[in-house]
């Protein structure tokens, strides 16, 4: 008997390790361990936690519709494994790996526990389009790519030649067993989590991610190149929340996009390459998760952080974007860059404060991708924005939403202003953008020189 741990793969089809599990020809226990370190009651109230639990509820329904068994518990994965191993004739432990520091530590503890119990282990990475080691070998690289454009050019070649199709094995090809009640009782869900899961269930469509993908490819892909930065148009794919939780496979997403014969696919596929580039950095850049410890942040402060978080900066596009984030958990990618750079550059707040805020608020939160965006805006990491690049939020607003439709939607109190006036800093603006730019260039130039 095997035990399968669901992670960021909240689906029942196109799972890399399901093929291997099928080849074992043995029944298995399928379990999702909700980890208190990653999901506590406060996080569950935020958009990121609610979205994740929404996908968990869908996973439950997928198992129920397939007449299969899924155990959902709350606790430490290694302790759950110890109890399972003591009660069932387990032989194999299987899961898809993750790459954040905590995930690596958690996975290593689980591997050590499995080996201490005399169990074999099967692991793999499932959420990248490329295999980093095979990709570097294909590119004949002994040093990792640090700039996106050459990475992307080689990535396209690799995908054209070796793109992995979706996996054929689904949950229906496996045999799952129901565990005894004492297992679930030992690691029972807190009442608040049980209520959260129950509250999301009635409105869930089990095939929602696939429908969303098809809707985007048919209705929005033709205008994606022109519209993805025009945030007032709502032409983004809105697929990231499904991709980042594994509710839909990245292989399926790529394959269906690549099959589009209209010629509109390249711009969106480039965004999938950016996603792989951040994941590649997390594997190859040893400092990716430790930049906050590498620099002296004494020249920075958090005095203006609350104004930014509460949408009270007096800069209309910043306040509109932060309002949308707070109310819905969504924010267009262009505005994620603008708001992040505003906090880190114009307000001189260390990036990790904004990163932590987005961790709670973004419905589509992913630790690696969120960090990658904040590092870019802070001129840190591979292929980051130059330290002297300081986006002017007013100019960004004028360029990408000339009529101010987005600001009018989220800040209706400004809707009466003209198309020109609506973009401008308000009388209560907390910072002078010109002076802030000069200060940011000076401070970041000094910060980066210190570490050379």
Which sequence ranges carry the predicted segments?
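Glycine/tryptophan-enriched, flexible segments
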Residues: 119, 142-293, 400-401, 405-452
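Active-site-proximal binding-pocket segments
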Residues: 234-413
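N-terminal beta-strand-loop-alpha-helix module at the start
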Residues: 1-68, 436-445, 451
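Short beta->alpha junction loops
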Residues: 68-78, 309
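Alpha-helical structural signal in soluble globular domains
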Residues: 62, 109, 113-117, 357, ...
């Amino acid at each position: 008997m095997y035990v399968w741990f669901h992670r960021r793969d909240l689906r029942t089809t196109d799972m890399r390790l399901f093929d291997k599990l099928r080849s074992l020809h043995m029944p298995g226990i399928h379990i999702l361990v909700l980890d208190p370190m990653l999901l506590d009651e406060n996080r569950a109230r935020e958009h990121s936690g609610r979205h994740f639990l929404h996908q968990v509820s869908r996973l439950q329904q997928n198992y129920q519709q397939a007449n299969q068994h899924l155990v959902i518990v709350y606790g430490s994965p290694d302790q759950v494994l110890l109890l399972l191993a003591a009660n069932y004739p387990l032989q194999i432990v299987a899961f898809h790996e993750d790459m954040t520091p905590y995930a690596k530590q958690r996975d290593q503890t689980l591997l050590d526990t499995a080996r201490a119990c005399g169990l074999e282990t099967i692991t793999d990475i499932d959420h990248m389009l490329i295999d980093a080691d095979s990709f570097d070998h294909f590119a004949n690289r002994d040093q990792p790519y640090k700039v996106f454009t050459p990475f992307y050019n080689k990535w396209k070649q690799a995908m054209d030649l070796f793109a992995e199709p979706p996996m054929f094995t689904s949950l229906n090809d496996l045999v799952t067993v129901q565990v005894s009640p004492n297992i679930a009782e030992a690691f029972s869900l807190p009442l608040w989590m049980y209520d959260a899961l129950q509250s999301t269930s009635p409105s869930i469509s089990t095939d929602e991610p696939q429908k969303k993908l098809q809707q985007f490819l048919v209705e929005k892909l033709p205008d994606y190149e022109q519209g993805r930065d025009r945030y007032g148009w709502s032409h983004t794919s809105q697929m990231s929340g499904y991709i980042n939780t594994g509710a839909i496979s990245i292989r399926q997403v790529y394959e269906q996009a690549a099959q589009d014969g209209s010629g509109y696919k390249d711009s969106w596929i480039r965004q999938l390459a950016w996603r792989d580039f951040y994941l590649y950095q997390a594997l190859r850049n040893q400092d990716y998760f430790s930049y906050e410890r590498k620099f002296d942040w004494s020249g920075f402060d958090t005095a203006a952080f609350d104004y930014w978080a509460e949408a009270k900066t007096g800069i209309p596009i910043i306040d509109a974007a932060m309002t949308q984030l707070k109310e819905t958990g969504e924010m267009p990618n262009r505005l994620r860059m603008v708001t992040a750079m505003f906090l880190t550059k114009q307000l001189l707040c260390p990036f990790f404060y904004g990163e932590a805020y987005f961790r709670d608020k973004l419905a589509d939160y992913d630790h690696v991708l969120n960090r990658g965006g904040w590092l870019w805006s802070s001129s840190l990491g591979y292929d980051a924005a130059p330290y002297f690049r300081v986006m002017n939020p007013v100019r960004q607003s004028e360029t990408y939403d000339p009529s101010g439709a987005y600001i009018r939607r989220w800040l209706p109190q400004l809707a009466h202003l003209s198309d020109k006036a609506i973009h401008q800093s308000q009388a209560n603006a907390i910072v002078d953008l010109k002076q802030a730019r000069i200060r940011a260039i000076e401070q970041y130039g000094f910060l980066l020189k210190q570490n050379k």
